[in-house]
């Protein structure tokens, strides 16, 4: 799949190596089983090291900040640090069902992804549909006299795992998935 990045300076999402723009009208299906967390080490505005694990394996695989390998010296004023990261896997609801990974080390990005993780977990606990269909959006805010942007993962609908599976194999179309339609039961063949 492709990596999806968001710029807090421009408010633009960019997809893959060619920095393709993201269609604001494109729906994405979030896979809660793909939720990840970890650390990204930034030097000279580039990620030079990453540690990533499933949020469900945090107790066994999680790494504390004090246990991270040093890539110093760091220029903290230039943002050279190990930064916390959250992320999720998604599937574009397009003709090819492209797989995408969206991660963020910014506070606003982690807050947006973290909120979606919390909402999915809360819905799952009470047996409600817990797979969000989202649009990638953004909002502006002022910081130190500058206009900045934060990513917003805007849920259009929450769907069940069985409906999502039916959509992915073509048994439901996107409108039916958004509407919350249940997958059709396949008729069992009678043995002769």
Predicted regions and their residues:
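Short nucleic-acid-contacting surface segments enriched for D/E, G, S/T with interspersed K/R
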Residues: 114-135
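Polar/charged alpha-helical tracts
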Residues: 25, 115-122, 175-179
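Short helix-loop boundary/capping segments
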Residues: 97-105, 111
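Acidic, gly/ser/pro-rich intrinsically disordered tails
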Residues: 164-192
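Short, surface-exposed polybasic-aromatic patches that bind anionic ligands, especially phosphate groups
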Residues: 140
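OB-fold ssDNA-binding interfaces and closely related basic DNA-contact patches used
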Residues: 1-98, 143-170
């Amino acid at each position: 799949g492709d990596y999806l990045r968001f710029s807090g300076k421009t408010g633009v999402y960019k997809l893959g190596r060619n920095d393709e723009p993201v269609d604001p009208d494109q729906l994405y299906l979030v896979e809660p089983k793909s939720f990840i967390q970890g650390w990204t080490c930034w030097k000279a505005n580039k990620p030079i090291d990453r540690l990533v694990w499933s949020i469900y394996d945090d107790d066994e695989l999680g790494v504390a900040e004090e246990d991270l390998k040093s890539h110093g010296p760091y220029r903290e004023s230039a943002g050279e640090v190990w930064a916390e990261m959250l992320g999720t896997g998604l599937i574009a609801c397009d003709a090819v069902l492209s797989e995408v990974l969206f991660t963020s080390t910014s506070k606003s990005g982690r807050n947006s992804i973290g909120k979606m993780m919390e909402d999915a977990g809360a819905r799952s606990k009470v047996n409600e549909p817990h797979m969000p269909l989202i649009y990638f959006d953004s909002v502006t805010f002022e910081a130190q006299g500058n206009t900045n942007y934060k990513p917003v993962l805007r849920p259009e609908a929450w769907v069940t795992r069985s409906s999502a599976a039916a959509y992915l194999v073509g048994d439901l179309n996107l409108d039916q998935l958004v509407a919350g339609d249940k997958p059709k039961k396949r008729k069992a063949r009678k043995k002769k």
